[in-house]
């Protein structure tokens, strides 16, 4: 099953994979999406690799073979450190998609809402709920989106009082590219947004994919490139 949101010159495609969901595309508008067009984007399994090759799963769970940074990090006194959520229900319109997941073993419920507006801006909001007895220690809950292979540079911002928002641009390399803020607010060194772009992109033309954490407290922004060249961008508090 596919869910395709198309608005404001932007598309995002969700693909149901068993009891979970992956994001098959986020970026330029698509006129038509089929199961066949999504299937051809699947990466081959290399010799000596895992028998499953998870793509851009929304929750990026290690229990499903994901080897990068997860969406959720937390535990119950050292237990339930690796989650395995399943779809409970979902609802889609032409420009919105809401899905509820549950991990019965961990005692967690997770709701994620996607809204794609008329300007092509995608808003993502995640809410996690502890539905079991005892405390759950939440460490991180990040939202992630896939990037295409032509995204090979990062543009973000740094600064200090009287000279904030200075741009810096550099190549995407293997591993995590991270910008974090620990001031309890969006201070002078806050990057505002982290942008993945092609090295040929300039102020007049080219492709760019921007992710902003709309939060005035501590914040984290990631771009991750795995050894199989899987690229993604994400962030949270």
Q: What residue spans do the PLM features occupy?
A:
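Polysaccharide-binding surfaces and accessory modules of carbohydrate-active proteins
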Residues: 1-4, 8-13, 21-234
């Amino acid at each position: 099953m596919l869910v395709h949101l198309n608005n404001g010159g932007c598309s995002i495609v969700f693909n149901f994979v068993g009891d979970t969901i992956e994001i098959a595309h986020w970026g330029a508008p698509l006129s038509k999406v089929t199961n066949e067009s999504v299937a051809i984007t699947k990466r081959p399994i290399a010799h000596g690799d895992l028998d499953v090759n998870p793509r851009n799963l929304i929750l990026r769970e290690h229990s499903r073979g994901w080897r990068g940074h997860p969406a959720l990090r937390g535990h119950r006194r050292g237990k339930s450190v690796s989650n395995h959520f399943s779809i409970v229900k979902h609802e889609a319109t032409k420009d919105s998609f809401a899905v509820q997941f549950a991990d019965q073993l961990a005692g967690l419920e997770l709701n994620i809402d996607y809204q794609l507006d008329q300007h092509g801006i995608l808003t993502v909001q995640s809410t996690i709920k502890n539905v079991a007895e005892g405390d759950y220690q939440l460490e991180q809950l990040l939202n992630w989106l896939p990037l295409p292979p032509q995204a090979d540079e990062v543009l973000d911002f740094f600064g200090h009082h009287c000279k904030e928002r200075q741009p810096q641009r550099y190549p995407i390399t293997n591993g995590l590219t991270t910008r974090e803020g620990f001031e309890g607010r969006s201070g002078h060194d806050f990057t505002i947004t982290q942008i993945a772009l092609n090295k040929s992109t300039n102020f007049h033309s080219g492709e760019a994919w921007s992710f902003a954490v709309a939060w005035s407290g501590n914040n984290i922004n990631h771009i991750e490139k795995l050894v199989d060249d899987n690229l993604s961008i994400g962030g949270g508090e």
